Amino acid sequence: DGRTLRLNSLEFRVYFERVFREQTQVATTLAFAQDEASRIRYETLLQLEDALLEACADLNALAAARRDNRALGRRLQARMATTAPSCEATTRRTSEALDAL
């Protein structure tokens, strides 16, 4: 919704978790769709996957670091966290594209 959230706020943690879970769900759906796809459709799915992985790479890395209790600097965490809206938007577009296939 365009609001700025503090990294250490509960609101941000909830938002981060939601975006991460949605992205993971769409990535899983995408992987299963690739298994069943025709060659032409498979290429489209690969493009969608590449875009999703690129948009969500920092968010996934941040989630992995938190899961593994690895310390990251505040600036790095902040930079990584700023990619959440882009990941969210790409996840939404990917989900819509999957629904349309």
What spans do the regions from the language model cover?
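Acidic-enriched, low-complexity/disordered segments with a strong bias for Aspartate over Glutamate
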Residues: 1, 35-36, 50, 58, ...
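Long, non-catalytic architectural segments outside compact domain cores
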Residues: 1-10, 82-85, 89, 93-101
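Immediate post-signal-peptide N-terminus of mature secreted/exported proteins
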Residues: 1-40
